[in-house]
Amino acid sequence: MHAISQIRLTFNQDRPDLHDDDSAGLAVQEAKPALQAPPMYKVVLFNDDYTPMDFVVEVLEMFFNLNRELATKVMLAVHTEGRAVCGLFTRDIAETKAMQVNQYARESQHPLLCEIEKDG
């Protein structure tokens, strides 16, 4: 019986369509999971009366890779509107960036506040 199984297995590997017990004729396909884009989060800077504008520009350049011109525009939006979006990221990245900004601001003894908000 053992020898027959080996022959049958070899036969099945060479020509799987000729084996009677095989379920190859069955039209079953594994369902593919529907993938969705991860939810995005805005990283928001809030204005205060004590943090220098140059420090805000430095933070935007350092943590958000903005060039000087764009960092200055975002800083002015924070200053005039009270808040501005620094970037749009997945949740983990947004939380990390906000934490880094808040930690750097505290180490530099500035009350700058950065938070995340769900987009949309």
From Swiss-Prot:
Pfam families: ClpS. Gene3D superfamilies: 3.30.1390.10. It comes from the Bacteria. Disulfide bonds: none annotated. GO terms for biological process: protein catabolic process; proteolysis. InterPro entries: ClpS (IPR022935), ClpS_core (IPR003769), Ribosomal_bL12_C/ClpS-like (IPR014719). Binds to the N-terminal domain of the chaperone ClpA. PANTHER family: ATP-DEPENDENT CLP PROTEASE ADAPTER PROTEIN CLPS (PTHR33473:SF19), ATP-DEPENDENT CLP PROTEASE ADAPTER PROTEIN CLPS1, CHLOROPLASTIC (PTHR33473). Belongs to the ClpS family. This is ATP-dependent Clp protease adapter protein ClpS. The lineage of its organism: Bacteria, Pseudomonadati, Pseudomonadota, Gammaproteobacteria, Pseudomonadales.
